[in-house]
Amino acid sequence: MGFIPIIKRDAQYKDDLSYMFIANHTSMTDIMLMLYTTKKPFVFVGKKELSKIPLFGFFYKRTCILVDRNDARSKLEVFNSVQKRFNMGLSVCIFPEGGVPDDMDILLDNFKDGAFRLAIEHKIPVAPMTFHDNKKRFPFAFFSGSPGKMRVKIHKIFLTNTLKVEDKRNLRNQTRNL
């Protein structure tokens, strides 16, 4: 498609650790760039309603941990599924904005607490990254976008082993302000 990933790293991932990968979510290419960037096995946590999209949904529900954000029981199931993946040595990826904003002018929407709560409860480091160009290269608007660079910034890793659940908002704000 003519995209050239350029990665700048402030941190390196350790092979023997699981991580909570987070990034801004502005484009359909975010998932592919996350897979390209991390080089570690991981599973996405995503919205259950996306599993209803024809064809895409077939693969989506077989490869992701699905959450129904309106169902407390679903959130508990996500907690258990995430723990199972961490026990298998996998990492988890969540886009903390909870989806792509409908407003094309929003560059970074508010973060939801879920990724940070899960990371703290499981004592898993948070590995934030920023996708600078994805919205410009391949936005959700039809007939727009262009080939070119897709810059990724891998930020410092936030350790969670001393944090309590009450610290989730502070962790959320620190990562969002990167």
Regions found by a protein language model. Give the residues of each.
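Residue-level detector of flexible, active-site-proximal loop/helix-junction positions
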Residues: 12, 51, 71, 133, ...
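Short, charged, surface-exposed secondary-structure boundary motifs
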Residues: 53-57, 76-78, 154
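Non-catalytic C-terminal accessory region of glycerolipid acyltransferases
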Residues: 78-178
